[in-house]
Amino acid sequence: MYAVIKTGGKQYRVAAGEKIKVEQIAADVGQEIVFNEVLAVGNGAELKVGTPLVSGATVSVTVLAHGKHDKVSIFKMRRRKHYQKRQGHRQQFTELLVNTIAG
């Protein structure tokens, strides 16, 4: 069984027992979270697609860790003007373990 959930402005296809990294969520490590924004639920050949959400469907997850992704380097330059600008960014994430999918 799998589901498509929406969190942090993105959509993720998840299955029970999977680990996923999502945009940072304000929750403690070990805390259980329930996602109600389920866009689709599938089980083999059967697929329920919501309009826009599947009513009564939930996905239960546990927070495993918080962290930062690898650094992304940004370099801007204007030719012949001696303008150079360097910038770096590390996006924060939350690692989740999918416990159950109901719906």
Curated annotation (Swiss-Prot):
Family matches, as InterPro entries: bL21-like, bL21-like_sf, Ribosomal_bL21, Ribosomal_bL21_CS
One GO CC annotation: cytoplasm
Transmembrane segments: none
Keyword S-adenosyl-L-methionine belongs to the record: no
GO molecular function terms listed in the Swiss-Prot or TrEMBL record: rRNA binding; structural constituent of ribosome
UniProt keyword annotation of DNA repair present: no
Listed NCBIfam families: L21 (TIGR00061)
Assembly with partners or alone: Part of the 50S ribosomal subunit. Contacts protein L20.
Family under the similarity heading: Belongs to the bacterial ribosomal protein bL21 family.
Protein name: Large ribosomal subunit protein bL21
Originating species: Albidiferax ferrireducens (strain ATCC BAA-621 / DSM 15236 / T118)
